[in-house]
Amino acid sequence: RKPYLVHARVPLLGHHTSGVRKEFYRDETDLEKHHAHDPFRKLHRKLIEAGITESELEVIRQEAEWRIEQDFDRAVQAAEPDANTVSSHVFASTPIEQEQGDRTPKSGTKVVMVDAALFAIRELMNKHPEAMVYGQDVGKRLGGVFREAATLGDQFGDHRVFNTAIQEAYIVGSTAGMAAVGIRPIVEVQFADYIYPGFNQLVTELSKSCYLSMGKFPIPMILRVPIGAYGGGGPYHSGSIESTLLSIKGIKVVYPSNAADMKGLMKASYYDPNPVVMLEHKGLYWSKVPGTEEAKCIEPASDYILPLGKANIVLEADGNYLADGDTVLIITYGMGVYWAKEAAMEFPGQVEVIDLRTLCPIDLDLLTARIRLHGKCLILTEEAETHSFAQSLAGKLSMDCFVQLDAPIQVMGALDLPAVPMNMALEKAMLPNAEKVAARIDRLLND
């Protein structure tokens, strides 16, 4: 049937809170005026007009009252929960724990990141009829402003790939209902800067559902978010939001930096029974930014899956420098991977670079092991540095690796500005880059 829109004015008939009773600020005339429009009274009248008798309605009322009393008594008499279970059910268990499939098939060809994501979703939709894609401009006519959903609408039809209104709260919040009826939604917010209207749904619904239901109602969904500064996008199309996302417990956050990781993480995110936010740097989509050519990769086979929570060493230091204690470890993600690798070229063999790939869950085992090996560490982010995820991670790792550190763990991020400027010179001044990273490496190695 067609959907119905109900536009109703509903009066407040009860107390606002137990401490602010209705009689404090409303007189009898006002209360009676609104009680005349009480939906329960109206429903009662409608049922009588429809032929239901008062005695039948009384039986229904008594049955409802009895059921409520039974449920209340059962809740009161229930045993107190075991305090040791307080951290249970933050996430539902994922079936993907090991890397699977062929990452670099011999017959494969190189693809850009945006296509790797597209191909992953196409394979998922071919295999799983419950997969559905929707968001702003992702339908067949445009296929996404970055062509990240191109051809999906033509291939799978408007009932599985469709546009939504410019309403991020709906895009995010609707996934809870979709998941409840067995659909696996893959949705998109067009730019990271526009995600904030959807945060209420991420916080109050998606992140809490598994925990509050004791694991009965996790919400499997993927929220794709193009992110990062690229080509003078300005204050409303260049933002980074990972620290804000990571303050929400109960969601997972991934941030691939190359096409192979993008495809593998997209597959793992789909099979994960929890909400997953996939941050996709616009500057890496097509490898058009100088120095990002390695974001193009051989397209992994259709069976390739990369589990969440596994960081990757993308550049290793030379063993001789390592033995002399003359190396530095850079921990980064997204565009930071390419800034770090370019900067490392000025210090051959002295720099190791780790790509986090997943920000939550995070691969603390690898990070602590490598920091203890190197003794010096720089955490690199595109976000404004102060109060960032990177600073929080630095604090955690400093405590865990304090004895083995040769210097305080350093953090490098963007300037603490409220927005990314549109002017390219100002954008460059605000953000990290390879030159700035190289200067920081030099200080770590030589001061």
Residue ranges and their predicted role:
Residues 61, 80, 142:
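Conserved phosphate/pyrophosphate-binding and hydrolysis machinery centered on Walker-type P-loop NTPases
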Residues 66-67, 78-83, 87-89:
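The feature marks non-catalytic terminal segments
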Residues 49, 74-81, 92, 123, ...:
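A structural signal for alpha-helix termini and helix-coil/disorder junctions
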Residues 1-77, 87-286, 297, 428, ...:
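Thiamine diphosphate
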Residues 1-2, 52, 80, 129, ...:
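Residue-level recognition of short, well-ordered coil/turn positions
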Residues 84, 260-263, 365, 435:
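Residues in well-ordered alpha-helical elements
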Residues 9-14, 81, 89, 96:
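Core structural elements
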